[in-house]
Amino acid sequence: DFSEMQTLHFEGGALLKSIDFAKPFFEADLVVSLSKLKTHQLMAYTGAMKNLFGLVVGLNKAQMHYRFYDKKDFSKYLTDLALASASQYAIMDAIVGMDGPGGPGNGDPVSLGFLAGSQNLLALDWTCASMVGYNPYDILNLSDALSRKIWLEDPSEIELVGESQQSIGQLKFRIVTETRGVTSLQKMLPGWMNSIAKKIFIKTPQFQHKACIRCGRCIEICPPQVLNFQDEQKSKWKKKDKE
């Protein structure tokens, strides 16, 4: 049951000192990340470390995307999450992966034909990302995790046991090279236009007054919690400082 959450306090986070995980996390003897090798529209690649985002309950995921809308900040958040989870093992299912620009939900199935596992989640992701054609340094959450020097000091420390990449052969996999999001746009704009771009391209909820029956459900499920009823006649934004 992942409907309830509980707060975990931890040390060493770059952005967070506490994080809310699903209650079963606190009842488990160990954490194993069972991940599928996929492309990702925002992060380019998703694997063992990104998979731990599944420990976050329901709408809290959307809240974290809203809070850390910049991809660099979201990458740091993912590293904090992996650190807090203290996952002891990870298995990567790459028998059939997902490639193309639609990942992780609307990409295309691609036969890769291998399984991989490691006690070191970053080492596993670094290796698998390399095998399908990525430069892991270009994957923001992996490069951030490497910079922390918690899982690895240097990729050269990674030791492969079992089938070599050469024996598996050249894998046909369409990587994501251009990710979506405000951060991607910022690279093409002068600094003074960044704040304007954020206002234009960050999605914001709006009431549909003609369809509204004032049930209040949208207020309950709004990830940034910025909606409220103003009076008996109409609904509008509730001003809230962004964290």
Positions of PLM-derived features:
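Extended, low-polarity segments enriched in aliphatic/aromatic residues
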Residues: 1-208, 217
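Short pre-active-site segment immediately N-terminal to redox-active cysteine/selenocysteine motifs
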Residues: 210-211, 221
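Iron-sulfur cluster-binding cysteine motifs and their immediate structural context
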Residues: 217-238, 243
